[in-house]
């Protein structure tokens, strides 16, 4: 069985540990700078192999003004709270039918989760297809404002 002592074990205790003159391994200049220094110069090949997308622009960021922000409300929430909305006079009774404007509640879209137990006229800027069909099935009207 061969027991070969490794080079670093042999050099322990020596002044320079294989680095030649002690001045040679002093400071960051020995390794070409600190951190990612020289990524576009003398460490360019390292960057190409290990971090190829470091330089340049990638992707696209949509301008925030073009993104439409929806604040939706479900039919189940409207149905559960209709008595409270009538008491607070947010929803009103006109010609025997309840009329509710969801923009007064701070919402701008009505979604179709749940169902309506009473006929309600709901006014909103946007409706989902399922919400329109469920409102009309209950005898109400989906009015786009």
UniProtKB/Swiss-Prot annotation:
UniProt keyword terms in alphabetical order: Ribonucleoprotein, Ribosomal protein, RNA-binding, rRNA-binding
Pfam annotation, one family: Ribosomal_L27A
Ranges of biased composition (kind: Basic residues): 1-13, 22-33
Cross-referenced InterPro entries: Rbsml_uL15_N, Ribosomal_uL15, Ribosomal_uL15/eL18, Ribosomal_uL15/eL18_sf, Ribosomal_uL15_CS
GO biological process: translation
Domain of life: Archaea
Annotated spans, Disordered: 1-41
Cellular component GO terms held in the UniProt record: cytosolic large ribosomal subunit
Record GO terms (molecular function): rRNA binding; structural constituent of ribosome
Quaternary state and interactors: Part of the 50S ribosomal subunit.
Similarity comment text for this entry: Belongs to the universal ribosomal protein uL15 family.
Chain's role: Binds to the 23S rRNA.
Name recorded for this polypeptide: Large ribosomal subunit protein uL15
Organism per entry: Methanosphaera stadtmanae (strain ATCC 43021 / DSM 3091 / JCM 11832 / MCB-3)
